[in-house]
C-alpha cells in the first residue's frame, strides 16, 4: 500500500526593518490571495509585531489601523524616557493589548515565535511562551530607541534583529519544511542618506510635512509642549527642528538606525548563506525612512508586489 504524501509545512520568517516592516502586511495578503497559508510564523522586531497580528487572526483589522496612521498618531505613541532609550513603549503595547492581541503564545491559534537579544550575554532568545504582547515588546526594543525589557527570569532583552534579523532558524525549529523569508534590508546600501547640499532644483517629496503639521504645532504650543517636540523633530529622520524641510545632514537618530540596519543586512547575508530559505521576498523600500510609520500604504503595496514576483520560487517546492 502506497504511503500518503505528507504536505510540507510552510513557515514564514518576518524580518526586522522599522517602518518598512509594514510591507509584511502586504506579503501576508499576497500569500493568502494565492492560497498559501503559513503553518508557523515568527518574526524579529517589526516582523514580530505583524506576525503576532496574523497569528491572532487580526491581520485585516490591523492593516486597516496601520493604513490610517498619520504623523500625529505616530507622535502620540511616543512616551519619552530619560534613561535606557528614548521611548518606554508602554503606550504602544497598552494599545496593542486592548485592540489586537493579549493572550499567551501557547494558546495562539497559529504557532508563533519572536526573537529577542539578551543584552548581558548577547545570546539569541526565542520567545515561545508567555504573553504575546510582552514578546512583541521585547522583540521591538531597538537599542537607543526603546527601553530594554526585563523578563521575570531577570534577563534584560532588546531587539531580536540585533542577532537574527530574519529568523529562518526559528521557523525551522518550529517545524517548517519550507521557509519563506522576508528581508527588508536587502537594498539598505541604496538608501538615500541626505547629501549635505541638495542638487539645484531638486525637491525631496518624501520629507514634506504632514498636512496637519501647523495644527499639531499649535496644539503643542497650547499644551506647553513645543520645546520638547522641537527636540524630537530634530532627532527624527527627514525633518529639521521646524519639521518643514529636509536636513542638510542626517539626524543623530537617522545615523544610529541606518547603522543598525547595515549591520543587520550583513548578519542576514551571512546567516542566509548557511541556512538558505526556500523563498526570499525582498521588498524594495530604500526610499522609506526608518521611522516613516505613517507611510504604510506604499510599504504594504510593495510587500504585495515583491511577494507575487517571488512566488515562482515557492511553486517548485509546493507542486
Name the predicted role of every residue range.
Residues 1-44, 52-319:
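Patatin-like phospholipase
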Amino acid at each position: 500500500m502506497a504511503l500518503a504524501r505528507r504536505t510540507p509545512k510552510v513557515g514564514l520568517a518576518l524580518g526586522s526593518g522599522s517602518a518598512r516592516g509594514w510591507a509584511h502586511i502586504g506579503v501576508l495578503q499576497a500569500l493568502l490571495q494565492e492560497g498559501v497559508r503559513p503553518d508557523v510564523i515568527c518574526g524579529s522586531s517589526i516582523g514580530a509585531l505583524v506576525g503576532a497580528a496574523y497569528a491572532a487572526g487580526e491581520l485585516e483589522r490591523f492593516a486597516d489601523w496601520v493604513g490610517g496612521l498619520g504623523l500625529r498618531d505616530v507622535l502620540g505613541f511616543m512616551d519619552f524616557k530619560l534613561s535606557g532609550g528614548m521611548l518606554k513603549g508602554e503606550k504602544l503595547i497598552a494599545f496593542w493589548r486592548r485592540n489586537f492581541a493579549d493572550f499567551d503564545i501557547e494558546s495562539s491559534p497559529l504557532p508563533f515565535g519572536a526573537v529577542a537579544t539578551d543584552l548581558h550575554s548577547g545570546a539569541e532568545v526565542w520567545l515561545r511562551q508567555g504573553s504575546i504582547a510582552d514578546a512583541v515588546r521585547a522583540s521591538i526594543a531597538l537599542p537607543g530607541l526603546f527601553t530594554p525589557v526585563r523578563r521575570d527570569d531577570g534577563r534584560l532583552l532588546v531587539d531580536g534583529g540585533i542577532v537574527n534579523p530574519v529568523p529562518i532558524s526559528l521557523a525551522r525549529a518550529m517545524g517548517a519544511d519550507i521557509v519563506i523569508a522576508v528581508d527588508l534590508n536587502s537594498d539598505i546600501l541604496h538608501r538615500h542618506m541626505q547629501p549635505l547640499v541638495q542638487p539645484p532644483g531638486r525637491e525631496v517629496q518624501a520629507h514634506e510635512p504632514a498636512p496637519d503639521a501647523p495644527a499639531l504645532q499649535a496644539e503643542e504650543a497650547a499644551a506647553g509642549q513645543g520645546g520638547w517636540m522641537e527636540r524630537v523633530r530634530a532627532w527624527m529622520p527627514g525633518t529639521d527642528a521646524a519639521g518643514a524641510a529636509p536636513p542638510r545632514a542626517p539626524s543623530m537618530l537617522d545615523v544610529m538606525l541606518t547603522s543598525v540596519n547595515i549591520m543587520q543586512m550583513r548578519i542576514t547575508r551571512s546567516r542566509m548563506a548557511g541556512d538558505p530559505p526556500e523563498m526570499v521576498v525582498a521588498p524594495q523600500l530604500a526610499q522609506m525612512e526608518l521611522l516613516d510609520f505613517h507611510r504604510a500604504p506604499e510599504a504594504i503595496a510593495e510587500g504585495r508586489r515583491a511577494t507575487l514576483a517571488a512566488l515562482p520560487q515557492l511553486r517548485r517546492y509546493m507542486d
